Amino acid sequence: MKKSIIAFPRIGSNRELKFALEKYFRKEISEAELQIVAKELRLESWKSQKEAGIDYPISNDFSFYDQTLDLSIALGVIPERYKKLKLNELDTLFALARGFQDEENDVKARPMKKWFNTNYHYIVPEISKETVIKANFSKLLNEYQEAKTAGFETRPTIIGPYTFLILADYLSGVTEDAILSDLIGAYTVLFDQLNNLGGEWLQIEEPALVLDQTEEEQQLFIKIYQELLKNKNKLKVLLQTYFGDLRDSYQEIIKLDFDGIGLDFVEGRESVKLVQKYGFPQDKLLFAGVVNGKNIWRNHYQKTLSLLKDLGNIDNIVINTSCSLQHVPVTTENEIKLSKEILNHFAFAKEKLVEVSEISEIYVKKNTSLLDKNIALFDKNRVQENIQLKQKITHLTDKDFIRTPSLVERRADQIKALRLPLLPTTTIGSFPQTPEVRKARLQYKRGELSKSDYEAFLEEKIKECLELQENIGLDVLVHGEFERNDMVEYFGEQLDGYIFTQKAWVQSYGTRCVKPPIVWGDITRPQAMTVRWSAYAQSQTSKPVKGMLTGPVTILNWSFPREDISLKESTLQLALAVQEEVLDLEKAGIKIIQIDEAALREKLPLRRSDWYSEYLDWSIPAFRLVHSKVKAETQIHTHMCYSEFEDIIPSIDAMDADVISFEASRSQLSIIDALKAHHFQTLVGPGVYDIHSPRIPSSQEIKIQLEKILNKLPIEQVWVNPDCGLKTRGNKETIPSLTHLVEATKEVRKEKITYDK
């Protein structure tokens, strides 16, 4: 039985890629030096896979930024405004991802969206009338040859044409028909080139197949591959799917001339039933995704073997991961502070390679010692249940999830209490974390800085941050979050039930890596988490300072969740803990409390029929539970970013927050139309500039954005803010950008008042 994975993490076990890229962006190393780091990371990945017994090591899973962006470059799908910059290929890629600004040019970054239901983000391809598909697969071919030279016969992977078409933005009436023929031609060129190099396999990733499909989309997929597979010659082609099942098109797909089909048996709820009902062709390999590529818990071998047995008499099975391993950390080997007893329950990417091999060994060779060892792990009670917490959740009633008075009624109380101008200006929460801030936090963690000295340092930074905001002229201030390393980890560290790693980093986008905490047991709040800093900040200014919290859904979605209880139960545990913090902030005199739900959309099922019963019916009430007991005059804010929210606007309104800020700048404010169409009641702050790009927007640019918003929404409903927190930016970008934001807002206010007179 062969062993396979879909892809391996590219950031390196110590984030080597992140640090090399940041040096390159600062012009501290050359492209050649950057490429050396990349080559070392690829070699390490292939070695790890081969040593673990993987029969099909993967190539072209490496990327300097994003695999969808790599495909756009390979297909020549580069908008003219980026071509005019006359940059080399690598710097063009970075301009698309990050924007580009110099004395002569000022080009915004392309929009960034969540990759299906994960916390990874992709750069959205743009198709216009000017788009001309031109195949240049040198990256894929070079990396395949690089592996071959190093002694590894790899299976290159690439996102497929169907998923590319589904994910792309189409401008000015253009449809996929405009580029379809050339797109198929480009992949045909790749087939020929890989054949000429002696390539054995090509993996084509088509995750868009697990979304709800229309009849037209099913026909589009069949049309593409009936044409494309005629040209495969000796090359074997694997259709790889993940994040769900193929219930809309399985019967048609298995008739196509693929040599292998990869199915997800972890998130694909219907995958086993589809194979049982319609069979699986004997002339193809079934790449069975049975090792979870998205969570860090050990595989339960007995359950996996039972699943494989349920597939029936299929001889041609390859043991595979359910999705790319880029969604989990690289290895547990670096976790020297966690006990062996705890680590035994975890499998990061390298450990999942071993799991794939062991499942194959048990299945084929009936290796009972491996199976017995795994069974012993699951036979023990890992954690003790918190009976008191369970009873608290059981006794929740409908009243616990409803805030009174209503949104409209309490708005009058808030206007009176806060006395804010039209178009109130604010930021999303965090301010730039300078090397000085990170150094002090590290010294405190290591015991090199006393608690009193560290707190004095933080108080000084908060004062500076407040003074900066007052000088700029912002209306609602934040304390800057200098005490926080990460918006989830910071809370997890103060909640019982979480455990933490040292180096379990996962790529979120580009150079941005996150270290998700792990939900180990039942979650409770032993003491206040943020009150100390919010209360101190409010004591330093007469302007309102927002209390800053992360919401329960986001905390869970950006953690590695338990698999022994439901996501709903874990979320309600978190909601009760955050509710306690909200009420403590209110008691401390904080009049505006922001409860971020940046990741609300993330775990939304990919199929619309599952949205409510599987997710929204409990995730939205969990948010309401957090703030249901506050006073009418306390204003509740929330923030959401980098997802498509247009189709769940009624559910977002049902969160019953008083103000919601959205990412909107990269997506050309498209969400505004959806808000208007759904008669959205909540006050809104659509982000007026993109903080994920280093470019500085002019006040005129922000003014134009504001005017676009006010053409569609009443001025009384609008707040003005950037589209996300400022932690990852520098002061040299943040200060002028916020200054321009306030200047633009004041101009629009002045014009509005003059017009009204």
From Swiss-Prot:
Pfam families: Meth_synt_1, Meth_synt_2. SUPFAM superfamilies: UROD/MetE-like. Its cofactor is Zn(2+). It catalyses: 5-methyltetrahydropteroyltri-L-glutamate + L-homocysteine = tetrahydropteroyltri-L-glutamate + L-methionine. It is an enzyme of class 2 (transferase). L-methionine binds at I428, G429, S430, E481, D596. Zn(2+) binds at H639, C641, E663, C724. It comes from the Bacteria. Catalyzes the transfer of a methyl group from 5-methyltetrahydrofolate to homocysteine resulting in methionine formation. This is 5-methyltetrahydropteroyltriglutamate--homocysteine methyltransferase. It comes from Lactococcus lactis subsp. cremoris (strain SK11). The gene is metE.
